[in-house]
A protein has these predicted regions:
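Short, low-complexity disordered leader/linker segments with a strong preference
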Residues: 1-15
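Short, well-ordered beta-strand segments
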Residues: 17-19, 50, 75
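Short, polar/charged alpha-helical segment
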Residues: 25-50
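Early extracytoplasmic/lumenal segment of secretory-pathway proteins
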Residues: 46-60
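Alpha-to-beta junction loops
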Residues: 44-47, 63-77
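Extracytoplasmic "Venus flytrap"
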Residues: 17-33, 54-58
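Contiguous mixed-secondary-structure segments that line small-molecule binding/active-site clefts
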Residues: 36-37, 68, 78-107
């Protein structure tokens, strides 16, 4: 993930929206909460991440569109919804493309 638009000269706090479709008990959501805490801590409170789980701001496709329009700063999606935006990603949806996990990570 890339964070852009973080002006160090501003005294006011900035808030970034992060939306995803996972439940709040999911480990990835827990990691996002940890990241949000660290960002707030390391930025001395000047940068905050508000997390919207469980498709509160839309499904994966809608969140990608919101990113493009600038309504969201970050999202987490699976590869499948990305195929409509980045056609080259379709290669990863081919069944049996990889022999096993080791082959996947080598590629």
């Amino acid at each position: 993930m890339t964070l852009t638009g973080c002006d160090r000269t501003s005294d006011s706090a900035r808030t970034l929206k992060l939306a995803h479709g996972l439940d709040t008990t999911h480990p990835v959501h827990k990691a996002m909460e940890f990241m949000a805490e660290k960002v707030k801590e390391k930025s001395l409170g000047r940068l905050r991440i508000d997390i919207y789980p469980s498709e509160q701001l839309g499904n994966e496709k809608e969140c990608i569109e919101a990113l493009q329009l600038g309504y969201l700063a970050m999202t987490k999606t699976s590869a499948s919804p990305m195929e409509g935006f980045v056609p080259k990603i379709r290669i990863f949806g081919i069944p049996y493309l990889f022999r096993d996990a080791e082959h996947f990570w080598k590629v």
